[in-house]
Amino acid sequence: MSACLGFRELGLQPYEPVLEAMRRFTEQRSPDSQDEIWLVEHPAVFTQGQAGKAEHLLVPGDIPVVQTDRGGQVTYHGPGQQVAYLLLDVRRLGFGVRELVSRIEQALIGLLASYDVQASAKPDAPGVYVDGAKIASLGLRIRNGRSFHGLALNVDMDLAPFRRINPCGYAGLAMTQLRDLAGPIELDEVRTRLRGQLVKHLDYAEQTTLTGGID
């Protein structure tokens, strides 16, 4: 079991500065650096992963498109979606990539179960699904044994922009969100429950809230 996992709650932040901060953190961290998870919402943005194809951006319209270095294909971020960036020393944790993905999926499934929503993962399509509709997306990058990027959970948001793309490269993939499955949801409470599930499933002994910026 690892020691302490630090969380930063960043509120609503533009995507690109957070992306650059993740890269800097990953490049500059030492073998003794504490693992961190950054909890954030983004203004409307499409992000294209390394496997993304231009034809999966159907009608982006006025929503910006950002090319990223995470795994996966195109997805949408917007207010009311809880994003968590996992800045972990995966080598120190002793996880392979597949195990890390599975542990993140199990944390999300556990969170949803706490709202009486039964969800599952698919071995051939990372993420978490409810009755075939996707509620959470995953996209990671591992560099020198350290992870960055992470997960996006649809909580209480406008899902319409997902219709402008083929989410994760799948034409017609249905998307859902926690509000539509469990009624009115407080995002603060979702964050608290998500923190607990990530600490549990990533096998940390405790958690702490980190203060200060990410510049």
UniProtKB/Swiss-Prot annotation:
InterPro entries on file: aa-tRNA-synth_II/BPL/LPL, BPL_LPL_catalytic, Octanoyltransferase, Octanoyltransferase_CS
NCBIfam families: lipB, PRK14342.1
Note: In the reaction, the free carboxyl group of octanoic acid is attached via an amide linkage to the epsilon-amino group of a specific lysine residue of lipoyl domains of lipoate-dependent enzymes.
GO cellular component term, pick one: cytoplasm
EC number: 2.3.1.181
Top-level taxonomic group: Bacteria
Residues given in the record as substrate binding sites: R70, G71, G72, Q73, V74, T75, Y76, H77, S137, L138, G139, G150, L151, A152
Gene Ontology molecular function, alphabetical: lipoyl(octanoyl) transferase activity
Active-site residues, record numbering mapped to chain: C168
Domain (BPL/LPL catalytic): residue spans on this chain: 31-206
Full protein name: Octanoyltransferase
Keyword Acyltransferase listed: yes
Location within or outside the cell: Cytoplasm
GO annotation terms (biological process): protein modification process
Catalysis: reaction(s): octanoyl-[ACP] + L-lysyl-[protein] = N(6)-octanoyl-L-lysyl-[protein] + holo-[ACP] + H(+)
Associated pathway: Protein modification; protein lipoylation via endogenous pathway; protein N(6)-(lipoyl)lysine from octanoyl-[acyl-carrier-protein]: step 1/2
Entry's family note: Belongs to the LipB family.
Annotated site, Lowers pKa of active site Cys, chain positions: K134
PROSITE patterns noted in UniProt: BPL_LPL_CATALYTIC (PS51733), LIPB (PS01313)
HAMAP family (alphabetical): LipB
Biological function: Catalyzes the transfer of endogenously produced octanoic acid from octanoyl-acyl-carrier-protein onto the lipoyl domains of lipoate-dependent enzymes. Lipoyl-ACP can also act as a substrate although octanoyl-ACP is likely to be the physiological substrate.
Keywords: Acyltransferase, Cytoplasm, Transferase
